[in-house]
């Protein structure tokens, strides 16, 4: 796959390349060749996005970690210069209450503290038997059904959806509804009208659920938020926004990682064998870290804006300029990882990947995602050792048009 590292980047008449960029059909797991060409030249550069603005694209591993940790960088998407993902996201920015995803400083700390309880290492470890049971039940159903089977529909999507539904206290029968509304705003060309409609529907649903949990609490995360509302620490709107974010992040990203990860393993059977034969949990854990590094499913950058001048990588990011922190080229940075374009599940230092971000804004649910991936990959390969792709790789429908990369379908046989 090393030929993907030197391809030219698309440029506008001004010489500033457009972003996002297209991936290579010949190597769908690699970051876009144009992005890798920019990264090979320098760790940050200007790019042009959908609205004509030219934020900084950060591709170097060290620079990514540095900016993730820099208090002069803001996640506040209301600030001028913030490089929004699409018109839909921009259109809803002043309609959404603040949340852990868009707050800085003490406000961010307050929100994160309110979300931390269900995602502690202890709570996640206690969930492992439940995740294992859900995984086994869906593999049982897949084995009992016809071939080929769509692994996305049969396993990759329902497992994390069920897990996050149970964790949050959201009825699973509503999963199709929240998946639909969540997906609307994640599309590259989502319109303002579509995004507003989806966001309002999800927010209304979560607000009503928070109010219901205030009257009848249970052992779940939405009930925890409801208790915060009753204590005067959160408004119902804030609690609903936090719950909405967890609901979207808790199933969409993990589902994509399961589907794309299984595909990567199927086209690298020697590496699949490492997971299939693994008895040591440490080997399984490291394999997941390497898959996270190799695939980096948040494919079009974590969005930020500078509120002070920042000198980094030989450039100066001025206050008010947008920043896009691209995880994929950072995780393929040859200065940080030897042979980065190679999937190697025994890789030393794989845990240094930035797939979940870095610093104070790194993913609050990362321990849950790791547990799900460890269980699903190993169980699937051990229970169905003859699992194979039922179509040509070039015929697999990839999510090139989404914020989170993955596959729409994954036909498999055994």
From Swiss-Prot:
| The protein's required cofactors | heme
Feature: compositional bias, Polar residues: 1-12
Q: What is its EC number?
A: 1.14.-.-
Q: List the disulfide bonds.
A: none
Q: Where is this region: Disordered?
A: 1-21
Ion transport in keyword set: no
Q: Which residues cross the membrane?
A: none
Q: Identify a single GO molecular function assigned to this protein.
A: iron ion binding
Pfam (any one): p450
Identify the InterPro entries for this entry: Cyt_P450, Cyt_P450_B, Cyt_P450_CS, Cyt_P450_sf
CDD domains the record matches: CYP105-like
State its role.
Answer: Can bind oleic-acid derivatives, amphotericin B like precursors and a variety of nitrogen ligand donors.
> According to its UniProt record, which protein family does this protein belong to?
Belongs to the cytochrome P450 family.
Q: What is this protein called?
A: Cytochrome P450 CYP105Q4
Q: Which organism is it from?
A: Mycobacterium marinum (strain ATCC BAA-535 / M)
Lineage per the UniProt record: Bacteria, Bacillati, Actinomycetota, Actinomycetes, Mycobacteriales
């Amino acid at each position: 796959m090393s030929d993907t590292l030197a391809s030219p980047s698309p440029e506008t008449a001004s010489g500033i390349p457009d972003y996002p960029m297209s991936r290579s059909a010949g190597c769908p797991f690699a970051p876009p060749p144009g992005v890798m060409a920019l990264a090979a030249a320098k760790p940050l550069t200007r790019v042009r996005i959908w609205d004509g603005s030219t934020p900084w694209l950060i591709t170097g591993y060290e620079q990514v970690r540095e900016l993730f940790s820099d208090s002069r960088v803001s996640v506040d998407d209301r600030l001028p210069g913030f490089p929004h993902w699409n018109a839909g996201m921009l259109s809803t920015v002043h309609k959404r209450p603040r949340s852990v995803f868009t707050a800085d400083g003490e406000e961010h700390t307050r929100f994160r503290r309110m979300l931390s309880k269900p995602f502690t290492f202890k709570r996640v470890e206690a969930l492992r038997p439940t995740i294992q049971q859900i995984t086994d039940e869906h593999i049982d159903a897949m084995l009992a059904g016809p071939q080929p089977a769509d692994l996305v529909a049969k396993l990759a999507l329902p497992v994390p959806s069920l897990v996050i539904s149970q964790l949050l206290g959201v009825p699973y029968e509503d999963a199709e509804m929240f998946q639909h509304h969540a997906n609307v705003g994640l599309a590259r060309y989502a319109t303002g009208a579509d995004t507003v409609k989806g966001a309002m529907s999800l927010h209304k649903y979560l607000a009503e659920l928070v109010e219901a949990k205030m009257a009848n609490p249970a052992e779940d995360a939405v009930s925890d938020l409801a208790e915060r509302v009753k204590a005067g620490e959160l408004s119902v709107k804030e609690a609903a926004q936090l719950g909405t974010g967890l609901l979207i992040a808790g199933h969409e990203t993990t589902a994509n990682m399961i589907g794309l990860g299984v595909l990567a393993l199927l086209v690298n059977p020697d590496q699949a064998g490492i997971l299939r034969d693994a008895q040591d949990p440490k080997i399984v854990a490291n394999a997941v870290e390497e898959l996270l590094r190799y695939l980096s499913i948040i494919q079009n950058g974590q969005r930020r804006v500078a509120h002070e001048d920042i000198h980094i990588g030989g450039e100066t990011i001025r206050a008010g300029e947008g920043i896009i922190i691209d995880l994929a080229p950072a995780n393929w940075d040859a200065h940080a990882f030897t042979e980065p374009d190679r999937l190697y599940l025994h890789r030393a230092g794989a845990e240094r990947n930035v797939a979940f971000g870095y610093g104070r804004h790194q993913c609050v649910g990362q321990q849950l995602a790791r547990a799900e991936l460890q269980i699903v990959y190993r169980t699937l390969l051990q229970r169905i050792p003859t699992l194979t792709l039922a179509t040509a790789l070039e015929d697999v429908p990839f999510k090139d048009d989404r914020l989170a990369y993955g596959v729409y379908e994954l036909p498999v046989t055994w």
